[in-house]
């Protein structure tokens, strides 16, 4: 038993230059663990609540000094002396201490920083890397990266309504090769955009953010880049979308403002299904809005046996909401974002529930990231087989990919790459 003897916290900056929380947990053995908390731009209405100061004189009101003080004060007092190896008890105590149903009292950012830092400390005490410490099956799976190479929506200041256009190197023989495939397509895409006189600046997640005549035009340009890089669309590399449709859904209507088009739920599902017929799209995230469960039913009936349908804003990594979705037979996959739910234990529970129901899980970053690499270890430890952590630029994104390269090297033939079998309905 390694007892917690100290917990430190500080206000740091994320990849958008906004404050976030970092925590360190120190054990009586001398082992230490540290974790930094990300932050989203397009957030689900039912996500756990991050605590911001609201003081307009500091960071435009986005400071997190209150959350930091909650770590240094009540959280430290409550956890000191507890066994860091008992993650479930640590997280249960944090939830009880907060007392709300959305972690809004202490702040999900304060709670998550300590929850993850505790796991890192316990892993260090066990003299294991985090992925090995968290793994329970003895099997390890390197994830297929879902690389967001064109950014739109809330992640970029451009004309594209939909948030992410991704490539999935499902045909690669290893994670290392998958990363190479993606990087080569990324650079080919930059050349395609430049040759057309389009902007090659990047958005929050490192993907390009050009102004295009339509959302569909982004797909065409990516397919051109895949072929230019020497790969076969649909074989070596497939496509994924994060529609983030809650961002443009109101009063029962989906509005693609850049195209001047409006759709009912059924019409928008038809629109996405037509793209699946036409292009090698194998995964669609948040194709329907989080509150349009009727639309999700239509969407799942239409595409749920053909491709992967991922719920992000729909499920917000919440085990209880996921169970409701499974009972309603909507979607067939869940996006896993640790800060949506706020503790490691609940995150792992969501992955377990999804797997038991035959749903896939995609471990994900947030648009406001840090150099922390915890999600890379979680993806490998839980064998989800998929990770979404941005494009092939910006060190806040590349840090996760580089961590996965190191994990792959450490595991050698003890691990395999997820490939086509990791994506729902693709194997």
From Swiss-Prot:
Record-level Gene Ontology MF annotations: magnesium ion binding; phosphopyruvate hydratase activity
Catalysed transformations (reactions): (2R)-2-phosphoglycerate = phosphoenolpyruvate + H2O
NCBIfam families: eno
GO cellular component, one term: extracellular region
Keyword vocabulary terms for this entry: Cytoplasm, Glycolysis, Lyase, Magnesium, Metal-binding, Secreted
Signal peptide: none
Membership in a protein family: Belongs to the enolase family.
Name of the protein: Enolase 2
Record EC number: 4.2.1.11
Top-level enzyme category: lyase
Taxonomy, superkingdom: Bacteria
Subunit details: Component of the RNA degradosome, a multiprotein complex involved in RNA processing and mRNA degradation.
Chain residues that bind (2R)-2-phosphoglycerate: 163, 337, 366-367, 388
Source taxonomy: Bacteria, Pseudomonadati, Pseudomonadota, Gammaproteobacteria, Methylococcales
SUPFAM superfamilies, alphabetized: Enolase C-terminal domain-like, Enolase N-terminal domain-like
Compartments it resides in: Cytoplasm; Secreted; Cell surface
Active site: residue positions: 205, 337
GO BP terms, alphabetized: glycolytic process
Residues the entry annotates as binding Mg(2+): 242, 285, 312
Pathway in which this enzyme or protein is active: Carbohydrate degradation; glycolysis; pyruvate from D-glyceraldehyde 3-phosphate: step 4/5
Function statement: Catalyzes the reversible conversion of 2-phosphoglycerate (2-PG) into phosphoenolpyruvate (PEP). It is essential for the degradation of carbohydrates via glycolysis.
Cofactor section: Mg(2+)
HAMAP family: Enolase
Cofactor info, note text: Binds a second Mg(2+) ion via substrate during catalysis.
């Amino acid at each position: 038993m390694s007892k917690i003897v100290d917990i430190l916290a500080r206000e740091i900056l994320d990849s958008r230059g906004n404050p976030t929380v970092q925590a360190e947990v120190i054990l009586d053995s001398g082992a230490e663990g540290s974790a930094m908390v990300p932050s989203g731009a397009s957030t689900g209405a039912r996500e756990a609540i991050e605590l911001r100061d609201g003081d307009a004189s500091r960071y435009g009101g986005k400071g997190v000094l209150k959350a930091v003080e909650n770590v240094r004060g009540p959280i430290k007092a409550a956890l000191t002396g507890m066994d860091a190896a008992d993650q479930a008890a640590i997280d249960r105590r944090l939830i009880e201490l907060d007392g709300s149903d959305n972690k809004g009292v202490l702040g999900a950012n304060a709670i998550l920083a300590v929850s993850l830092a505790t796991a890192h400390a316990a892993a260090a005490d066990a003299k294991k890397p985090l992925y090995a410490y968290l793994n329970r099956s003895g099997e390890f799976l390197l994830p297929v990266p879902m690389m967001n190479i064109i950014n739109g929506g809330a992640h970029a200041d451009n004309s594209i309504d939909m948030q992410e256009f991704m490539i999935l190197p499902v045909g690669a023989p290893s994670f290392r090769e998958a990363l190479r495939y993606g990087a080569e397509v990324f650079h080919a895409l930059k050349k395609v955009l430049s040759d057309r006189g389009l902007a090659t600046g990047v958005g929050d997640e490192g993907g390009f953010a050009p102004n295009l005549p339509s959302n569909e035009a982004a797909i065409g340009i990516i397919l051109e880049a895949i072929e230019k890089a020497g790969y076969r669309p649909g074989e070596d590399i497939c496509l994924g979308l994060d529609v983030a449709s809650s961002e443009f859904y109101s009063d029962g209507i989906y509005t693609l403002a850049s195209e001047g088009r409006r759709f009912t739920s059924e019409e928008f599902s038809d629109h996405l299904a037509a793209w699946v017929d036409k292009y090698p799209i194998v995964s669609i995230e948040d194709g329907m809005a989080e509150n349009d469960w009727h639309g999700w039913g239509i969407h799942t009936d239409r595409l749920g046996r053909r491709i992967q349908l991922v719920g992000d804003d729909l499920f917000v990594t919440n085990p209880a909401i996921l169970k409701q979705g499974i009972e309603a037979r909507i979607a067939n996959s869940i996006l896993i974002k640790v800060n949506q739910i706020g503790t490691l234990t609940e995150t792992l529970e969501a992955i377990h529930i999804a797997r038991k129901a035959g749903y896939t899980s995609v471990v994900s970053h947030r648009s406001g990231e840090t150099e922390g690499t915890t999600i890379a270890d979680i993806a490998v430890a839980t064998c989800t087989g998929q990770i979404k952590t941005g494009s092939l630029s910006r060190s806040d994104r590349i840090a996760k990919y580089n961590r996965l390269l190191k994990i792959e090297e450490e595991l050698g033939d003890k691990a395999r790459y997820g490939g086509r079998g990791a994506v729902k309905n693709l194997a």
